[in-house]
Amino acid sequence: MKAFSPVRSVRKSSLTEHSLGIARSKTPVDDPMSLLYNMNDCYSKLKELVPSIPQNKKVSKMEILQHVIDYILDLQLALDSHPSIVSLHHARVGGSTSRTPLTALNTDISILSLQAAELSAEFTDESKSLCP
């Protein structure tokens, strides 16, 4: 009787893993370093675009995000207080709005979902009575 070992050959498994690694192309999800470099590029771009971030000083990612949030809030305030936007908003409130509020759309979708569930239950009950 011949004895055998339950352990696989190291050479065989490493060769298989190596050949699979070559055949498969790496995506950003597969390569964490690629994802990290991509995120760092995004932070660099944000640092360039936001005027309140000092360009010649090293800032943390958290500081960059805080500057971005502050900048967006400042832009929103400037937009809300701009005279032409304020007059446009008052004209729209007085007249009819051209778009449906999202709450009304969500309510309609909920009603349709309930109706579809009821119809599905009715069809299931009918098919059970037709097929003994």
From Swiss-Prot:
- Please give the Gene3D superfamilies that the UniProt record associates with this protein: Helix-loop-helix DNA-binding domain (4.10.280.10)
Per the record, the GO terms for biological process are: cellular senescence; embryonic digestive tract morphogenesis; endodermal digestive tract morphogenesis; negative regulation of gene expression; negative regulation of transcription by RNA polymerase II; neuron fate commitment; positive regulation of blood pressure; positive regulation of DNA-templated transcription
Source domain of life is: Eukaryota
Q: Report the protein name in the record.
A: DNA-binding protein inhibitor ID-2
State the oligomer form and interacting partners.
Heterodimer with other HLH proteins.
Q: Which SMART domains match?
A: HLH
Q: Motif range for Nuclear export signal? A: 105-114
Native organism: Xenopus tropicalis
Q: Where in the cell is it found?
A: Cytoplasm; Nucleus
Q: Molecular function terms in GO for this entry?
A: bHLH transcription factor binding; protein dimerization activity
GO cellular component terms, alphabetically, are:
cytoplasm; nucleus; protein-containing complex
In terms of PANTHER family, this protein maps to: DNA-BINDING PROTEIN INHIBITOR, DNA-BINDING PROTEIN INHIBITOR ID-2
- Keywords in alphabetical order, please: Biological rhythms, Cytoplasm, Developmental protein, Nucleus, Repressor, Transcription, Transcription regulation
What CDD domains does this protein map onto? bHLH_dnHLH_ID2
